């Protein structure tokens, strides 16, 4: 699925819609150059699920955990930024396997830096700069990822 995002608000909305339909245990890879909107999309995702604080790219910490507790659910979400990762094995030393537990949602920026160590993505999101906004492409790989793409097609 491909869509044009005219501005930051459209990127936030995509993140919000994604959050509303994303099942627990989903792994989402975010691809794009610096400034392409990856962290903006994550911000929309987290705010849609009730996070009220700032959302920053965990460039130096590699992962930022979020525990969102609602009236009916509790959800662990992990936002990774692997831009500064020098070796995928560093994720092992950070306890990375614990983050990819069955019920957590993992949003991974720069997943190519963790290639060979990271689990397969349910969904790949590619963001690309254009003069008048951004182009986004979503590719589902698992049943969960394919279902997400179909749901988003109907909403966006």
What are these regions (language model features)?
Residues 1, 86-91, 97-156:
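Short phosphate-coordinating micro-motif centered on Lys-Gly-acidic
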């Amino acid at each position: 699925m491909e869509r044009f995002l005219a501005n930051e608000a459209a990127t936030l909305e995509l993140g919000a819609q994604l959050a509303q339909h994303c099942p627990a245990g989903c792994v989402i890879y975010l691809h794009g150059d610096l400034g392409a909107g990856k962290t903006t999309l994550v911000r929309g995702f987290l705010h849609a699920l009730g996070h009220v604080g700032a959302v920053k790219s965990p460039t130096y910490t590699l992962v930022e955990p979020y525990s969102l507790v609602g009236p009916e659910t509790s959800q662990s979400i992990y936002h990774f930024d692997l831009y500064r990762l020098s070796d995928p094995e560093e994720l092992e030393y950070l306890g990375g396997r614990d983050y990819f537990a069955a019920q957590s949602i993992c949003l991974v920026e720069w997943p190519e830096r963790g290639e060979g160590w990271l689990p397969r993505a349910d969904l790949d999101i590619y963001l690309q700069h254009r003069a008048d906004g951004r182009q986004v492409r979503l590719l589902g790989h698992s049943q969960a990822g394919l279902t997400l793409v179909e749901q988003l097609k109907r909403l966006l």
